[in-house]
Amino acid sequence: MSLVYVNVMIAFLISLLGLLMYRSHLMSSLLCLEGMMLSLFILGTIMILNIHFTLASMIPIILLVFAACEAAIGLSLLVMVSNTYGVDYVQNLNLLQC
């Protein structure tokens, strides 16, 4: 296993650890999720390029599309919670239930 793979996996684990530790604010949770998606994108791209599997070259692009949709929904939820309650605590999301 090369050093690049190890670094990308460490970046993913640090983002996952940040997501588990800093759950109180929605903005920090969204940043950790984006870090996880970025490390998955880099890992998938490097693996596809190393094994020369050109048929799967669209998979990282599809992952980026889903990451962009996740970021847009997360930011709109952040704006809605911030405008409604004035803070971005994750515990306020329980109040959004119908």
Curated annotation (Swiss-Prot):
It comes from the Eukaryota. GO terms for cellular component: mitochondrial inner membrane; respiratory chain complex I. Its main location: mitochondrion. It catalyses: a ubiquinone + NADH + 5 H(+)(in) = a ubiquinol + NAD(+) + 4 H(+)(out). It is a multi-pass membrane protein. The keyword Transmembrane applies. It is found in: Mitochondrion inner membrane. It is an enzyme of class 7 (translocase). Its EC number is 7.1.1.2. Keywords: Electron transport, Membrane, Mitochondrion, Mitochondrion inner membrane, NAD, Respiratory chain, Translocase, Transmembrane, Transmembrane helix, Transport, Ubiquinone. Signal peptide: none annotated. GO terms for molecular function: NADH dehydrogenase (ubiquinone) activity. GO terms for biological process: ATP synthesis coupled electron transport. The keyword Glycoprotein does not apply. Core subunit of respiratory chain NADH dehydrogenase (Complex I) which is composed of 45 different subunits. This is NADH-ubiquinone oxidoreductase chain 4L. It comes from Urotrichus talpoides.
